[in-house]
C-alpha cells in the first residue's frame, strides 16, 4: 500500500471570540491551514458591536490568560492588550455605618500582584487583527453552523451577510456552503452549535444550570474633569446578602458596573423608579446620586437587558480525532471569580500542549498517524481539562457568596491575614490563599481545590489546638486559685467560638 504523501492539516474553528481567535493563532503557528467561521459580523466594525455584544461586562485578565496569550508568540499583540489594560490590585468594599459612607481596600495578593481589567472589544480586535495578518488563516463572518458530519468530517454553514437574498423557492433560506476539515475546534460559546452537533456522535454527560440571579449593566461616567470618580485600581464591590453591585474601571475613565440580584428582586425594582432608587440607597450606599444620577440609573435599568447567568458542565470535550470543544462551549462558568476568559484561553494552551506532546503536527507522519496522534491528544485533554473545568465552575459559585457577604466578615479577614502572613514570612511552606492560586498561578484548578482543602484542615486543627491549650491553662488556674476564678463562662464562650470558626474555615467551606 502506497504511503500517503505529507500535507498540511485543515482545521475549522467555529467562533471568532477571544478563545476561538487564540486557537486559530496556535494552529496557524504549527502550520495548519485555518478557517474561522463566526455567526456574527466582523467584531472590529464599530457599527456592529452593539448588535453583537449581548455581554459587555469588562473582562478580568489574570496570569492564566496572559501566559496563554504569550504562548502565541505574538509579542506586539500582547503588548497592545496589556498597555490598554487597567491593573486592579484588590477589592474596594463599600458600605455605610451610622449614616457615614466608608470604603475598605482588600489587596488580592500579599506580593502586590494584580488582575487586569480589559475591554472586551480591545482584546478581540487585537486577536482578529493578528489573524488577518497571518497568511494561512481565513476569516468568514456572518456564517452560521447548521450541520456537521463527524464521520466524513464535513460541516455546513449558512452565509448570512447583510443584503443576501433567500434562495429562489425557499422559505427564507439563505445560501449554504459545505466545508471539509481534518478537525474542528468548537469555540462558539455557551449555546454552542458545535457542541450540539458533537453530541449526536459522542455520549456527552451534560449539565446546564441557571442560577436565580439576573444581571444588568450600568455605567459610572468620568468626573466633570475627565477623571475616574473612584479608585481605578480596584474592583469595587457593594456587597449584600442576596445581591451585589460591582464596578470595574474602563480606559475612558468610566466604570462598567453590574447589578447581580434574584429575579424576584428585579421584579420589585421594575415596578417603579422610586423603588429602584430606594433600593440602591439602602443596599449600595454612595452609588446614586453620588456616582450615577437617579435619572441615568433609571434609564440604564430600563434600557439595558436583564440577563440570566448560566453554568454548564460537559464531559467529554471531544469526539474521536474529529472535534474538540473549548471555552464556554465546554464549560460556561459564573463570572464571580473572573476566570471565564482565563479558563477559556488556558484551554487553548493546554490543548496544544497535548497536541505537541503527541506529535500531531509532524509533517513527516502520514495523515492516518497524525489522526491517531490527535485522537490520543484529545483524549488526554478531556481527561485533564474536565476535572479542572468542573473545579473552577464550583469555585465560581462559591465565590459569589464570598463577594456578596463573606468579604465583610471578621472570620474571612482572619483567615486571609493568617494565610498571607504565612506566604510572606514563611515562603518555604508554599502557603497561598485560594485566590492567589487561582488568579496568580497556572496551577491546575483541581489541584488548587485539593491544596486549599488541606490548608483549611491544618488551620482548623491548629486553631483547635490553641483553644484546647487555652482551656487547659484556664482549668489549671482555676484549680490553683479556687474561688477566685470560675472557668465556666470562659469555657462556654470558647467552645462556641471554636464551633463557629471551625464551620467557617473547615474544608467544606473554603
Curated annotation (Swiss-Prot):
GO terms for biological process: 'de novo' NAD biosynthetic process from L-tryptophan; anthranilate metabolic process; kynurenine metabolic process; L-tryptophan catabolic process; quinolinate biosynthetic process. GO terms for molecular function: FAD binding; kynurenine 3-monooxygenase activity. It is found in: Mitochondrion outer membrane. Its main location: mitochondrion. The keyword Nucleotidyltransferase does not apply. Its cofactor is FAD. GO terms for cellular component: mitochondrial outer membrane. Keywords: FAD, Flavoprotein, Membrane, Mitochondrion, Mitochondrion outer membrane, Monooxygenase, NADP, Oxidoreductase, Pyridine nucleotide biosynthesis. It comes from the Eukaryota. Pfam families: FAD_binding_3 (PF01494). It catalyses: L-kynurenine + NADPH + O2 + H(+) = 3-hydroxy-L-kynurenine + NADP(+) + H2O. Its EC number is 1.14.13.9. Pathway: Cofactor biosynthesis; NAD(+) biosynthesis; quinolinate from L-kynurenine: step 1/3. InterPro entries: FAD-bd, FAD/NAD-bd_sf, Kynurenine_monooxygenase. Catalyzes the hydroxylation of L-kynurenine (L-Kyn) to form 3-hydroxy-L-kynurenine (L-3OHKyn). Required for synthesis of quinolinic acid. Belongs to the aromatic-ring hydroxylase family. KMO subfamily. This is Kynurenine 3-monooxygenase. It comes from Aspergillus oryzae (strain ATCC 42149 / RIB 40) (Yellow koji mold). The lineage of its organism: Eukaryota, Fungi, Dikarya, Ascomycota, Pezizomycotina.
